[in-house]
């Protein structure tokens, strides 16, 4: 990426540049200037600072990759002890749609221990190849081991794009893999579209849901995106299977971790609004926190759950995990009761 270079010999008074920067990114120590992480690359120091003191250096043009060498849309299989998270099936459905536009196969990456007998289920949803890494070392999620397996899969099979569920595991794993492969990652995508040249258009809300950002990774592979549960539609399960299951080998040294899982304490079962059939949604029209009591009473009468729009979550009146909309959770309840919403409030993901 581009960078700013300070030519110390041309800086007569460091304080001049310190004062120019509106973000406090210029630091002076022992008569020398440095740039910290607050820099926004606005280039004011280049334009208004002493001539030649700060230089903006563009990246050297990266050699274009051969996109034809990257083939297939891969889905990471999110599971706990072999029980596959439903977001996986939703992503398989989207992967099939994307793959059909460029005539690519659909892959599933399944890693864990004693999971081989669960892999066939994925074939009932239209996966062409399930790559299974079944080892005792992968019995519990360890970020080092899982990242190494992911890297091994990518280097051997070179998928064009990888879709991962935005779950607790997926949110940890996908960024590590993207950094390891030096590629881009778009989190919490709501729309995915495939171009004929195999570029994946990744669309997601930005700036609190006020705009939709369109993101491309044109000269890096694989292209990576995470998607929340219930954003995409899962395909129908079929009785027939046409794909194949491939047992993968890997050097045991690569999946050794420096962290051991000593014990697992399971949380008490918790209700999530994503799985609720009935929701009562409160918004900015609620003027006092005390007024939420009648909202909760209504939800209880309907055997449903309480949800809210962004203002109530930001006020701390309702937990953030109960927020719906572009900047909240994606839900698909049957009936939805909206109470006290202002005209400009929307729940676009409902």
Model-derived segments and spans:
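N-terminal glycine-rich FAD/FM-binding segment characteristic of electron-transfer flavoproteins
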Residues: 1-342
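Single conserved hydrophobic/aromatic residue that forms the stacking wall/gate
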Residues: 340-350
């Amino acid at each position: 990426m581009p960078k700013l270079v300070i030519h110390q010999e041309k800086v007569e008074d460091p304080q001049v540049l310190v004062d120019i920067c509106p973000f406090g990114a210029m630091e002076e120590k022992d008569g020398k200037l440095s740039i910290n992480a607050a820099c926004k690359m606005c280039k004011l120091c280049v334009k208004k600072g002493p001539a030649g003191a700060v230089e903006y250096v563009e990246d050297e043009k990266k050699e274009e990759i051969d996109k034809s060498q990257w083939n297939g849309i891969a889905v990471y299989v999110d599971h706990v002890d072999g029980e596959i998270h439903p977001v996986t099936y939703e992503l398989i459905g989207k992967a099939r749609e994307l793959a059909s536009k460029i005539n690519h196969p659909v892959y599933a990456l399944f890693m864990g221990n004693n999971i081989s007998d669960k892999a066939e289920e994925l074939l009932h949803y239209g996966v062409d190849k399930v790559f299974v890494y079944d080892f005792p070392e992968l019995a519990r999620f360890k970020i080092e081991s899982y990242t190494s397996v992911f890297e091994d899969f990518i280097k051997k099979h070179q998928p064009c794009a990888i879709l991962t569920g935005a779950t607790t595991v997926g949110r940890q794993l996908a960024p590590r893999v993207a950094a390891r492969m030096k590629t881009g990652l778009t989190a919490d995508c709501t729309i995915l579209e495939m171009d004929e040249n195999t570029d994946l258009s990744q669309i997601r809300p930005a700036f609190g849901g006020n705009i939709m950002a369109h993101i491309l990774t044109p000269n890096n592979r694989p292209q990576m995106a995470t998607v929340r549960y219930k954003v995409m539609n899962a395909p129908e399960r079929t009785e027939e299977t046409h794909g194949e299951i491939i047992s993968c080998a890997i050097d045991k040294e690569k999946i050794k971790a420096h962290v051991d899982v000593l014990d697992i304490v399971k949380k008490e079962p918790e209700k999530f609004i994503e799985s609720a059939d009935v929701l009562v949604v409160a918004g900015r029209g609620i003027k006092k926190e005390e007024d939420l009591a009648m909202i909760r009473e209504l939800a209880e009468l309907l055997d449903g759950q309480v949800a809210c729009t962004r203002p109530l979550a930001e006020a701390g009146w309702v937990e953030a995990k109960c927020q719906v909309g572009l900047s909240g959770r994606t839900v698909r309840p049957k009936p939805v009761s909206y109470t006290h919403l202002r005209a400009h409030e929307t729940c676009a993901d409902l």
